[in-house]
């Protein structure tokens, strides 16, 4: 962004955005939107409205402890592997899982790495920055491809819709997409 916001390379901060999106804790499509755009402003308003709609003031209460579970963490590891995300998350994700009472081991990362394709090469793993990744389909593409291949658990709960399948239906993903267009 070359200003306020996270860096344009795919480091820990942008990997966090990817994780929140693939775990269903962002609004659909929210990761990597430029911080000073009209779209970011619209997402901020929509996020506030969604937070209110799933709070105690509604009949659809979704506290984070009831939203994320083992499926969410497996999806997170697969997302991290498929996007070449920050290796810092090999420490952060097991700690987050432990805080939720879930055991996530490095061996789980190893096992999942054997079945998960690398779908994006964003700097420092390639020449494209995060803005180019987002413009080429970004998380919509990644989530759609991984769901189509049966690598993500689409029944995982999200803050939007009932599950990850509902979540992706809000995005502009159509399959099959040409993988050549994604950095």
Descriptions of predicted regions:
Residues 3-4:
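Internal gly/pro-rich beta-alpha loop/helix module
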Residues 85-88, 138, 178:
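Conformational gate/switch positions in structured elements
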Residues 9-11, 20-21, 25-86, 91-125, ...:
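Accessory "access/gating" subregions that flank catalytic or transport cores
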Residues 17:
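Active-site phosphate/pyrophosphate- and oxyanion-stabilizing loops and adjacent acidic/basic residues
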Residues 173-183:
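Single conserved hydrophobic/aromatic residue that forms the stacking wall/gate
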Residues 113, 120-172:
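Phosphate/diphosphate-binding loops
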């Amino acid at each position: 962004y070359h200003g306020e916001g996270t860096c344009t390379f795919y480091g820990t901060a942008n990997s966090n955005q990817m994780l929140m999106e693939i775990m269903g804790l962002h609004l659909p499509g929210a990761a990597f939107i430029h911080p000073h755009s009209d779209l970011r402003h619209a997402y901020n308003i929509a996020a506030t409205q969604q937070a209110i709609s799933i709070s105690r003031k509604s009949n659809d209460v979704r506290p984070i402890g009831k939203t994320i579970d083992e499926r969410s963490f497996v999806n997170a590891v697969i997302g991290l592997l498929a996007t070449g995300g920050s290796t810092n998350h090999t420490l952060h994700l097991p700690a987050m899982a432990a805080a939720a009472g879930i055991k996530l081991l490095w061996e789980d990362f190893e096992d999942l790495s054997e079945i998960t394709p690398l779908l994006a090469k964003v700097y420092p793993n390639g020449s494209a920055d995060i803005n180019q990744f987002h413009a080429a389909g970004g998380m919509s593409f990644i989530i759609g491809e991984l769901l189509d291949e049966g690598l993500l658990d689409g029944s995982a709960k999200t803050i939007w819709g009932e599950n990850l399948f509902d979540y992706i239906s809000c995005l502009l993903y159509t399959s099959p997409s040409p993988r050549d267009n994604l950095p």
